Amino acid sequence: MKKWKKKTFIPLLYLTSIVFLPWWVSFLFNKSLESWIINCCNTSKSETFLNDIQEKSILEKFMELEDLVRLNEIIKEYPETHLQKFRIGIHKETIQLIKMHNEDRIHTILHFSTNIICFIILSGYSILSNEELIILNSWVQEFLYNLSDTIKAFSILLLTDLCIGFHSPHGWELMIGSVYKDFGFAHNDQIISGLVSTFPVILDTIFKYWIFRYLNRVSPSLVVIYHSMND
């Protein structure tokens, strides 16, 4: 009995850790790496890195400041005290703009580093926990085996419609855009459109191949029900 409880508890603990481990790792590394990255960015003498979004935003801000400077030259009849305050305001705005750029740069480096570290840790954790994965796989297979063919076909149809259906490109666009943003990459409409138009097609081809090679051999009745629902 104790052995059975242990075999049940360990895979559940492993599953819980897989779900929450990325959050814990991300939080810990964000806190530990933030000060180090800030120091590196402040002391680094390398060239300033700007992605397309940051460059566009900063150029727009500087154009606004340039317009203000031109306005300053036009209104020469203003008292000297007013012009001095005007110059001080432009100087403060420029400093604030540089600070915003530095914060964006730190945020980009921090998130990219954290994501890479999380991926490495999760990969190593999954490789080392081979026994727990085998137990979880047996649970999933037993659960699927106990389902009726109708429920299986309905679940497959629902999943495929969500992932590769005619309305799925909007979801893929949001997901790919969020990944780009999370890794600090510039938003590129051409790359995102290319991925959205090709990735679901690749998934659809893989899924049809899986039905042809695996489901036709394991459960022909499930394939018949699936095609009936799909039609």
Curated annotation (Swiss-Prot):
**TM spans, by residue?**
9-29, 116-136, 191-211
Q: Which reaction does it catalyse?
A: K(+)(in) + H(+)(out) = K(+)(out) + H(+)(in)
Assigned keywords, A-Z: Antiport, Chloroplast, Hydrogen ion transport, Ion transport, Membrane, Plastid, Plastid inner membrane, Potassium, Potassium transport, Transmembrane, Transmembrane helix, Transport
An example of a Pfam family matching this protein is CemA
Tagged with keyword Phosphoprotein: no
InterPro entries given for it? CemA
Gene Ontology CC entries for this record: chloroplast inner membrane
* Localization in the cell: Plastid, Chloroplast inner membrane
Q: Which GO terms describe its molecular function?
A: antiporter activity; proton transmembrane transporter activity
A Gene Ontology BP annotation from the UniProt entry:
potassium ion transport
Biological role stated in the UniProt entry: Contributes to K(+)/H(+) antiport activity by supporting proton efflux to control proton extrusion and homeostasis in chloroplasts in a light-dependent manner to modulate photosynthesis. Prevents excessive induction of non-photochemical quenching (NPQ) under continuous-light conditions. Indirectly promotes efficient inorganic carbon uptake into chloroplasts.
Family recorded in the similarity comment: Belongs to the CemA family.
**Descriptive protein name:** Potassium/proton antiporter CemA
Q: Which organism is it from?
A: Manihot esculenta
